């Protein structure tokens, strides 16, 4: 009761809890509870605000540290100093600092960069140069910023983020070091933190603030120099080893050696007992009856199985001489049949041990040379021989081994000649081909000089089959050529000697000229089949590297042949036909796309690193110089791009008819295109590309540019390998001239002049480039050209036709077409070739023999708007100054809208159908039509090759 008299908080709680009907009677106590709950809620909200403020402060601190890091890194790279962060941001907005950084690591951009801007657009020009540098170095798109982010200051943290990523990327390329870490080393004022938090909060709401901590982890995962370093304490702990461990290890080694020696003795005794059964079996087989002989043969098979089971045990023996002893025991005092069954598995087991000790080969050579080679077949040594060439052995050991190989070849030829119905040509030639290819790679010239003639003579004396010998020998030669090209080596001097030994050993039975003619065509076919198989692996370069192989091959095959004056023309045409067939097959093969590798500390690229004109065209399109000149853009793309060349593979440019006549169909036109492409594209890549078309055609180059261009022409191997000797040799004229770039400009003006037919002024060239060869054709253009032709009919008279002898001849032979011919002015002949020559040139794929004497004449009017072609029954001499049908097709592409046909028989209409689709424009032809046309073209090509004259 005394406790209840003193009223306290506990007593109030008890009384309220004991109140009837659950009604609280003390109201001030309820207010206390409510106030306490509100107080706790306020405390939690205050704590959350404090935590958020601290997190925002730390985030702002990290951002400001990253800004200071970028500022310090740029100061070290550009040698500039900034007092405050505001000055640093103003310098970034100006863009000059970023442009200096781009010029430092991309000097090629600095040589080509010429500012043409107003005062208001200065910062955008600087930023464009910086963006070109980012494209060149391969910056990832998530790390890049836009111009408005920096110029209008929408997102400056994104710019700092890009600078950090650039530093890490340059560090990955081993050019500079990345930004230094200043986190925790700087002291920043509260006012700076508040301003930074406001900027960050706005960007976070828009989800545009970059994540700086993840940047370092991203680049460190891709970095090849990221290594985990161990501390010195851990290394010292590993080096210190207790003394009792060494004693335990020595005891274990002793126990294992004693155990191995005991096992080795047991195995050796067991093997000697089993090997002793072989001579006993052979003696019993020769002395007993037939029934007992069958029983002993079954026992011998069981013994042989037990011996094969011992081969696995041989692999685990520490001494390799035991396997050689086993091989020697099997060959001594035993028949050839048993030794031929036992030796191959033994040699297969030896191969596993050769990688550890190549000196075992000396033991093998000495053992088999002492035992004799008569008992062993050559085929058992094929795996060992191929394995041998992979080791580095002294020259004396290699000579002894090669002598053993040649003796084995001689013995195998003698054995095959003694046996009836036994053909070893396939196995021997396949084995010899592998040996020859490896021998060429090892440069074994003395080996070929000493032994090859004897082997080939004996082989031809014993085997008289023509087809197998020639086909196998061709396979040998093709494997030699492919192996040489695979190892990036020149074709050896022994190749003509091999051909002479193979094909001129039987000069008594066959004529040398017939054999030689068969060699050439068959060798070309075999070589191209082999190249088509190995193409995806070994042809990693561009199209010009394909011609180097053909050039080396032709020099080695025909360079040393001495010919008389009478047969010189025949050999020249024959060589040309072979080169044409080779290059035609090479052109149709697909080239893999090469990813350029950027090397060097300054990250500067030359024409050897990048030979892609698509980048140049993209560069021109960005500047807007060639947007109004589509044909000039198409001209460059036709010359340099191998992808676009597939569409126009039957077309070449119009060249001068006096000096640069091409007497071939597709291959030489391909080489002339590459000749022109080098003369056009190398100055563009080397930095001579001007800002406008007027400066490209008529700009005056400096002396430094001329010297640089001359050094490129002298040192570049691509130009020397591509230019054939039959053409005029533009590369030599460029190198010898004092002003090569001006010569290049004049050549470009001539090409454009051939398109236009006008004077060399800028206005006419611009008119031609804009309207003369446009890819878009409309009905209005056709109607206008037709009206223009109608006006020409009134002005021209019959005298103009009779002045030209060709037109007068046409008038006499073809009176029906006079009404149409007299109205047009045919200034010169585009083509005048016989149908037989067109068939040989593979321009016409199916043509009857009755039309071979007729001549196809093609004429064009002055304005290049109408084309007429017809046949003449006359076999006059052909003027070499006339251009080809491929040039005609290119002329059709440049602006001819009509095709007419006069006096053509019914079965020659496929010539018209073959010409007409090419004269159309690419926009009118669908993709399926191109596919079908390509199939028909390939089928015609195969039929033309199979047909003989």
From Swiss-Prot:
Give every Calponin-homology (CH) domain span: 64-170
Transmembrane regions listed in the UniProt entry: none
* GO terms of biological process kind: ascospore-type prospore membrane formation
Q: Which Gene3D superfamilies match?
A: Calponin-like domain
Cellular compartment(s): Nucleus
Gene Ontology cellular-component annotations: nucleus; prospore membrane; prospore membrane spindle pole body attachment site
In terms of InterPro entries, this protein maps to: CH_dom (IPR001715), CH_dom_sf (IPR036872)
Which controlled-vocabulary keywords does the entry list?
Answer: Nucleus
Report the superkingdom from the record. Eukaryota
Tagged with keyword Nucleus = yes
Q: Does this UniProt record's set of keywords contain GTP-binding? A: no
Q: Name one GO molecular function term.
A: calmodulin binding
Instruction: Tell me the PANTHER family matching this sequence.
Output: CALPONIN-HOMOLOGY (CH) DOMAIN-CONTAINING PROTEIN, RAS GTPASE-ACTIVATING PROTEIN WITH IQ MOTIF
Record's protein name: Uncharacterized protein C17D1.07c
What is the organism field in this record? Schizosaccharomyces pombe (strain 972 / ATCC 24843) (Fission yeast)
